[in-house]
From Swiss-Prot:
The active site is at residues 92, 204. Its EC number is 5.1.1.3. Pathway: Cell wall biogenesis; peptidoglycan biosynthesis. The lineage of its organism: Bacteria, Pseudomonadati, Pseudomonadota, Gammaproteobacteria, Enterobacterales. This is Glutamate racemase. Disulfide bonds: none annotated. Substrate binds at residues 28-29, 60-61, 93-94, 205-206. The keyword Cell wall biogenesis/degradation applies. Keywords: Cell shape, Cell wall biogenesis/degradation, Isomerase, Peptidoglycan synthesis. InterPro entries: Asp/Glu/hydantoin_racemase, Asp/Glu_race, Asp/Glu_racemase_AS_1, Asp/Glu_racemase_AS_2, Glu_race. It holds the Pfam family Asp_Glu_race.
Amino acid sequence: MATKLQDGNTPCLAATPSEPRPTVLVFDSGVGGLSVYDEIRHLLPDLHYIYAFDNVAFPYGEKSEAFIVERVVAIVTAVQKRYPLALAVVACNTASTVSLPALREKFDFPVVGVVPAIKPAARLTANGIVGLLATRGTVKRSYTHELIARFANECQIEMLGSAEMVELAEAKLHGEDVSLDALKRILRPWLRMKEPPDTVVLGCTHFPLLQEELLQVLPEGTRLVDSGAAIARRTAWLLEHEAPDAKSADANIAFCMAMTPEAEQLLPVLQRYGFETLEKLAVLG
């Protein structure tokens, strides 16, 4: 009988034998990275996917850079010990802006990060006003401001940092309704503008999960832009040209850092995304 929930680094009994496929890790502090994973899976359905989320240290947006770097390196190391990786995707804007150099120095497989889609948004805007919706950490970091200066210096950039929206996205995947009133309150600075942004960058991987609700609250015709499709294309290129030959015939698997009741409640969601099992990952440090 298949074991659907496992606590600890024990073999996954629910794995279904198949042809070996390149193993790709998608990692986030929470479940927002599933939006990126979905784009990658749509383009590359025949891979062995691992999804890992750090429900112990979630959310990363309020953590120090040193903590994030140490934590992300430790988690990727723990996954790599279980499954040799062909490629890893850090599907978290906050973690990507600070941890990529350390990851690329430590590991010999490609590591793909997620950055706010400032460049395409600057090309799409008609009124020259672009909104960046992200965590407070992403909004404050110099990397984000460098992206704006490089790719959108002729645009008016309106930034909103929100940790509450991350929580709303997590709650939605747990089956809870999203409060449109809460979104209106968060977006109030834009909604009060005489000419609000006509293009909004979803600068946190959690936020595409709220796309339907955001479109109900933002002015009609507002474009929402995220990095998911671009990350999928980059992943495909790297797997073809630079990835090591790291394959597995196991079924797709998800890892949490603590097997809490809240994590267990996510199993049906993870199964809808194609992950057969959820295990606790032992992380050193």
